[in-house]
Amino acid sequence: MIFGQRGSRDLGTEQPEIAHGTPATKMVVSGLRSQSGWEATNKALTFTPSPLKALTADREESDETSYRGGVTQGANLVPRMLFFVKEEGTTSRLGMSSGRVNYRSMRTPQEKSPWKSLPDLTGVIERRFIYDVHLGSTIAPFRALQPWRAILPINRDRLLEEEHIETADSTLAQWWHDATSRWEQNRNVTTKISLWQQINYQGKLTHQLGAPAHRVVYSASGTSLAAARLNDPRQVIEHKLYWIPARNLQEAQYLSAVLNAPLTTKTVAEYQSRGLFGARDFDTYVWRLPIPIYDSEQELHQRLVALAQRAEDVAGQTDLEGMAFQKARKVVRAALDAGGIHAKLNDAVAELLGLPES
């Protein structure tokens, strides 16, 4: 609703300043609605004034002097049962031809209808078409966990066009025929894109091919940021992760240190959407923070690299055998806390970003 005010015709009369922009503070309302009515609900709510941080598309720094322009979301490899597989041993007396493996769809309890009720995809595939894939569930702070395995129509760092998949290899052609048939028969009626368009939506798969030696990945959502570096350019990144290229090992460790600092999560929470258990989506909000480009001559940057190395050592030596990824992250963070690394990361990141220490 807009209220207008008629201006004075006397141009010589000083006019009050017109209200514009957004207020400096906001009122944060939290609590649960009471079934007893609004009066009881009002008593159950808390009202907390908080500084207002407005989201804006305006940028003070160009993509050449910040990391935000290089951040990319992973590929849409869903529905997962069409792509992710487990390798199986052969039952043939003659064994499997060299370079070929039996596969079966990898299934999880998190699958949704109608895909969870469909039978597995099974068959034989050339091993060169099976790729390691990292998802949100394969990343812990400062440590990449065991990647999943997926069949993808990629050959020599090139995503095969749909018409070329049929002629590239007979085993790949059979898998693609089976996968696309399932997709077309079971996709949502409002979904018009092909399976090929799905996996390369907005170029998120092709953008990864021919990747640099060092990349940093971080969780797209959650209550705490989890980031790790990858050093295998052939590994593929799924859409529950965002990734950013690094020029060298030290820059990758620098970024991992900044992203994994608890203070970073706390600061980014101001921008996040919120769910029942708190802030949830990180997306690219973290890059609204004034994170400077890595400079090896800066002592503070070197300190963050050293802290990342210590954190990687601690995370790598932590026993995570058999743990679900949520618990694995919790155990790694507890080890970093116990070693005093989180506190040192917070101190360094507060200095880097000009923030009050947590």
Residue ranges and their predicted role:
Residues T13-P16, A57-D63, K86-E87, F282, ...:
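Intrinsic disorder/low-complexity signal
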Residues S8-A24, L159, V216-A227, H301-A308, ...:
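Short, surface-exposed, charge-dense and proline/glycine-enriched linear segments
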Residues M1-P79:
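Flexible, glycine-/basic-rich loop-and-beta segments that form/coincide
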Residues Q15, S36, P49, T56-R59, ...:
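Generic low-complexity, intrinsically disordered sequence content enriched
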Residues L52, T171, V286, P290-S358:
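Non-catalytic DNA-recognition/assembly elements of restriction-modification systems
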